[in-house]
Amino acid sequence: MNQELLSVGSKRRRTGGSLRGNPSSSQADEEQMNRVLEEEQQQPRHQEEEHAARNGEVVGAEPRPGDQNDPQQGQLEENNNRFISVDEDSSGNQEEQEEDEEHAGEQDEEDEEEEEMDQESDDFDQSDDSSREDEHTHRNSVTNSNSIVDLPIHQRSSPFYTKTTKMKRKLDHGSEVRSFSLGKKPCKVSEYTSTTGLVPCSATPTTFGDLRAANGQGQQRRRITSVQPPTGLQEWLKMFQSWSGPEKLLALDELIDSCEPTQVKHMMQVIEPQFQRDFISLLPKELALYVLSFLEPKDLLQAAQTCRYWRILAEDNLLWREKCKEEGIDEPLHIKRRKVIKPGFIHSPWKSAYIRQHRIDTNWRRGELKSPKVLKGHDDHVITCLQFCGNRIVSGSDDNTLKVWSAVTGKCLRTLVGHTGGVWSSQMRDNIIISGSTDRTLKVWNAETGECIHTLYGHTSTVRCMHLHEKRVVSGSRDATLRVWDIETGQCLHVLMGHVAAVRCVQYDGRRVVSGAYDFMVKVWDPETETCLHTLQGHTNRVYSLQFDGIHVVSGSLDTSIRVWDVETGNCIHTLTGHQSLTSGMELKDNILVSGNADSTVKIWDIKTGQCLQTLQGPNKHQSAVTCLQFNKNFVITSSDDGTVKLWDLKTGEFIRNLVTLESGGSGGVVWRIRASNTKLVCAVGSRNGTEETKLLVLDFDVDMK
């Protein structure tokens, strides 16, 4: 029922469910309601006259003294209550109309805020069409069931239903039954305090009578007829209590089918208010927020449209901060609002951050692919390494240079010239760029000025790989050694020797160095003592790729296998098999490993269990070797020699779409490298046969939250 109330509140806001500002509609609805009330008032009178005639009584006779429980007197009192309720409702509507005229400007602001909330909710609805269809199907099944308590949604959101609901609740004199507004009016509760005066329930209600007693209405049975209880009623009730649950439901179905509409209406008037209590407003703020914390973000946005008090709770910044933590969203950006929020509504930066990230993810998944920025440079040479951080892109090439680009404008900011051989490896942090070359040197550059700060000499062959951690960089060379450098002073601090072939990959976490080489070995080093702690043996061919998270070492080899090692003991924990060729690239995050292979497949692994979770294949799989990959909590991005960049769903392994498709793909066009941020994708493309010009493509998936 509470879920239905949320849906009602949301629908009314979307359809302009308030009566304000539409006097013609309001007048017509009042006339219709008055006609219904007159019919209801005439029916008890006819019943009374017929009953009196059958018993030989005179209609309108004075009751006998002491006849305090006279049913006619109770009926007259109820009719009076009805007229009083109508008068109160009419006067209340008049006061509301006057208040609306005074606050028309404020209402416009509220409408704008509601439109914004509707847009936020729609964004989430669009992202989950299947779940929305399931909810619609479920709602229809509930509406079409034999239950008489729940009205269809369109009837609940009608102006006539809103008015009669108000009148109905005025007839229920229990002050503990909270009026739950279905329109735009604020809740009764505007402070974060629990409502006092509630009758505590000593035990969980087991019958509807217990529920009414818990709500303080145990003695408020409304009688709409003067007929005395029929004989045998108590026996029937005892028999009813002795039946099983399914038997009771069957009996109720038969009873409802045999009732007249007025009798069904009476049931609704008694039952419905008990299930329309705004339980959230009865709780302290902390408990209310705790309850709301179990809602999905899209449900929170719907809850915010129910009433003012729920919106205040659903806008809670700490609540949305927890939602952001669950999704790995960092500190929220200071997003400009289009207007000043009305006093009483606190804008939540964390909520804005969550919605922004959701819209960005939607852009990646199915947003329009706008024409990418094209960054041309390096002529027809190969782009051998690529770095992307913030709004700065750095590309290295076998033309002996590096280029620094703006990811925003697409302009080449500067070209770093100094190497005398091709650049084959690079790293970047803040304003520092480090490059390794076939000229056997490393160079440290200032990214802002393009100045070469240090040239690091020591290796006797090509610097093939490197890894930067804070102020130190570890380089691996074809001379079979590794060197640890201080990038501030340019000094070589340590030399690690032990491999007997070219070092192809290296990882460094500030405490341990892990290296893989063409000698089939993986080694774990203590750089401070320059000692090899473990030699990880097991591969039967060259080691081409490494990942290291401080606990596990993951190595990929030309022998087609991937091995998971314990860095402390040096033991092989798992051998991951399934690829058919060289594992060219890997990424490891939170025990999830994604590997790309020259056999054109990509696999997702759980390194704790050694299981392959997904294989990214099918009719849309790559048609050639996978060259590079990146992944986050939602997506996997892969590039290939077939000239495409593909987007996959990390959890399901399903293909989503192609992000880049080169016209020369399949005939020489290659995507060599990719680097992705939260909102941008940078691709290094070209060819070795002249069919595709060497360039960088920058795709933007950011959203405008202004």
Curated annotation (Swiss-Prot):
Annotated stretches, region: Disordered: 1-157
SMART domains xref list: FBOX (SM00256), WD40 (SM00320)
Keywords: Chromosome, DNA damage, DNA repair, Nucleus, Phosphoprotein, Repeat, Ubl conjugation, Ubl conjugation pathway, WD repeat
Record flagged with keyword Amino-acid biosynthesis: no
Phosphoserine modification, residue list: S26, S226
All copies of domain F-box, residue ranges: 277-323
Biological or metabolic pathway of the protein: Protein modification; protein ubiquitination
Positions of post-translational Phosphothreonine modification: T204
InterPro entries associated with the record: F-box-like_dom_sf, F-box_dom, G-protein_beta_WD-40_rep, WD40/YVTN_repeat-like_dom_sf, WD40_repeat_CS, WD40_repeat_dom_sf, WD40_rpt
GO BP annotations, alphabetical order: DNA damage response; DNA repair; negative regulation of gene expression; negative regulation of osteoclast development; positive regulation of ERK1 and ERK2 cascade; positive regulation of oxidative stress-induced neuron intrinsic apoptotic signaling pathway; positive regulation of proteasomal protein catabolic process; positive regulation of protein targeting to mitochondrion
Compartments (UniProt record): Nucleus, Nucleoplasm; Chromosome
Post-translational modification: Phosphorylation at Thr-204 promotes interaction with PIN1, leading to disrupt FBXW7 dimerization and promoting FBXW7 autoubiquitination and degradation. Phosphorylated by ATM at Ser-26 in response to DNA damage, promoting recruitment to DNA damage sites and 'Lys-63'-linked ubiquitination of phosphorylated XRCC4.
WD repeats: 377-417, 419-455, 458-497, 499-535, 538-577, 579-617, 621-658
Known partners and oligomeric status: Homodimer; homodimerization plays a role in substrate binding and/or ubiquitination and degradation. Component of the SCF(FBXW7) complex consisting of CUL1, RBX1, SKP1 and FBXW7. Interacts (via F-box domain) with SKP1. Interacts (via F-box domain) with pseudophosphatase STYX; the interaction is direct and prevents FBXW7 interaction with SKP1. Interacts with cyclin-E (CCNE1 or CCNE2). Interacts with PSEN1. Forms a trimeric complex with NOTCH1 and SGK1. Interacts with NOTCH1 intracellular domain/NICD and NOTCH4 intracellular domain/NICD. Interacts with NOTCH2 intracellular domain (N2ICD).
Domain notes: The WD repeats mediate interaction with substrates of the SCF (SKP1-CUL1-F-box protein) E3 ubiquitin-protein ligase complex.
Protein's UniProt name: F-box/WD repeat-containing protein 7
Classification lineage: Eukaryota, Metazoa, Chordata, Craniata, Vertebrata
